[in-house]
């Protein structure tokens, strides 16, 4: 999913095919989002800030779309309050790549050809368990037991789900249809783009505190 050199030509071909497909398919391919369930409640969200200091998260990953499948190992180096570098390594030593997220910006060596394969920043932060979508005056929240759901904004709508104060799901909804989403269940994280049938799954194997990272890792 990130700009590893070994598959860059495949990514460009996939992007061309996907752009033509989307021209005809459009938003209609995505499933309807439906309405929120539960009882109306004030829109007060749990705190999801990145833990103070630095973390090193190791994971297995697998990426699949209509023309490409790849898997390997990865490392996320996280620095509070709002910075993460994601490194992806293909199995078999076939290459690798990275993406840097600082606040609401993404940088990757693959440029626009690769960036189109990345989720929006808000969904990338949801992968890390952080809600990066500010509440708006028209936010609607509902509660059902220990599950809190809320719709934030209008077209796109960001639908967030918390279970016992933990962010477990974030969806991007446009014109009433769920275009893409991230879900978190224990050590498993999944990103799905409904229009282009793209998915990225992560299996977190370890999370450890780390000393401050070399400033060079944030150089773009």
Predicted regions and their residues:
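Sec-dependent bacterial lipoprotein signal peptides
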Residues: 1-29
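N-terminal leader/targeting segments and the immediate start of mature chains
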Residues: 28-80, 111, 118, 211-220
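N-terminal beta-strand/beta-hairpin edge segment
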Residues: 60-65, 70-106
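Residue-level recognition of conserved beta-strand positions in structured domain cores
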Residues: 88-90, 110, 172, 193
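Short, surface-exposed beta-strand-loop junctions and turns on beta-sheet-rich folds
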Residues: 91-95, 113-116, 155-158, 176
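A short, polar/proline- and glycine-enriched secondary-structure boundary/capping micro-motif
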Residues: 95-103, 118-121, 179-182, 200-203
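Acidic/charged, solvent-exposed loop-and-adjacent secondary-structure segments enriched in E/D, K/R, S/T
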Residues: 106-137
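Gly/Pro-enriched, hydrophobic low-complexity segments
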Residues: 141-220
């Amino acid at each position: 999913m990130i700009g590893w050199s070994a598959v860059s030509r495949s990514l460009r071909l996939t992007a061309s095919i996907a752009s033509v497909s989307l021209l005809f398919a459009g938003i209609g391919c995505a499933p309807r989002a439906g309405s929120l369930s539960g009882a109306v409640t004030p829109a007060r969200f749990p705190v999801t800030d990145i833990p103070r200091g630095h973390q090193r998260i190791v994971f297995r990953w697998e990426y699949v779309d209509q023309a490409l499948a790849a898997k390997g190992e990865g490392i996320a180096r996280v620095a509070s309050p709002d910075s993460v570098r994601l490194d992806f390594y293909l199995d078999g030593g076939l290459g690798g790549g990275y993406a840097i997220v600082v606040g609401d910006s993404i940088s990757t060596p693959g440029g626009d050809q690769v960036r189109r394969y990345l989720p929006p920043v808000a969904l990338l932060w949801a992968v890390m368990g952080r809600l990066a979508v500010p509440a708006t005056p028209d936010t609607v929240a509902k509660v059902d037991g220990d599950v809190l759901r809320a719709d934030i904004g209008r077209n796109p709508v960001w639908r967030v789900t918390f279970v016992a104060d933990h962010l477990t799901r974030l969806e991007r909804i446009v014109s009433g249809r769920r275009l893409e989403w991230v879900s978190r269940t224990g050590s498993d994280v999944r990103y799905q783009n409904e229009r282009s049938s793209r998915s990225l799954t992560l299996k977190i194997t370890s999370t450890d505190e780390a000393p401050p990272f070399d400033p060079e890792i944030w150089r773009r």
